[in-house]
Amino acid sequence: VKPIIATLIISTLCTPAALPALSLQSYSAASHHRFADDPAFIGNDYDWSGVAYDGDWFTRISDTYYVTAWHARAIGPATFYETNDPLGTTVTVGWDSLTRIGSTDIAIGRFSSSPGSSIAIYGIADETTTQATFASSSYFDMEAFVVGLNGTGGNTTTNFRVGRNEMDGFYDDVALTATNITDMITYDRDSPGLGADEAYLQSGDSGGPLFTTLGSELVLTGIHAGIDPTLSASSFLSNYITEISAIVEAGGESLTLISPVPEPSSSLLIALGAVILSLRRRVS
């Protein structure tokens, strides 16, 4: 079990601040506030409608199920925005139940009704990893979107900021407390290529999602758990797919699982075959 300064993690992300906000290298409302609804928003190519905030974070993973952090668990009604327009159409659903995944910081909640087809359901990255294998995994140095509070105050979904970071660390069995132990993926402040977008978790961000991308699709990879002085950490969902699936399937639903690295398309395979055949002909 690796304690990443457990007291600091919990107190930093759970202690209320006046106007907590995801820390960015250089914040711009146009680029980083989802509900500025600006063409410069770094997330404009993606669908953020399946993430809601009411003082804690909900991320939708099936028709009526969502994932959140156990130590900052989201319960109660959730309001989703169909677009990035703060005056746009919203969908509000009630809350039904919450189930913790073992002794981890991951919890699966259920809404009392479906938010409907206009609200995104996110697939979960299906590649597992460990501290020993992380450097050879698809995730190593992969860029990810980090969702957190915008610092505008209030327990509403419009308090929504997006930054980026590169996932460059992994720890097995991180102990937030003696009874809260989870595999975590981490990211720090040393990604100069990300410029103004580089993000670091702060108070209030616990339970928010960490997304990788595949084409124009957001792929759910982690749920924010905490920080220490040098890094941010998110609970790594892929290592708990069996447990998450069991809860969702017991309710008659299913997860969408996504490989973080796309398989070669049939057209690409055909093209490669043609190149190989051409080379063989030249040799002969």
Give, region by region, the residue ranges found by the protein language model:
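Chymotrypsin/trypsin-fold serine protease catalytic domain
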Residues: 106, 112-198, 238
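C-terminal subregion of chymotrypsin/trypsin-like serine protease catalytic domains
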Residues: 21-50, 54-73, 162, 170-173, ...
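Catalytic-histidine neighborhood of serine endopeptidases
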Residues: 62-63, 67-104, 114-116, 138-142, ...
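Short beta-strand segments
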Residues: 56, 89-96, 159-164, 219
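Short, threonine-centered small-residue motifs that mark membrane-proximal processing/anchoring sites
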Residues: 5-24, 249-270
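Short Gly/Pro-enriched turn/cap motifs at secondary-structure boundaries
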Residues: 99-100, 155, 198-203
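A generic structural motif
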Residues: 79-84, 147-149, 211-213
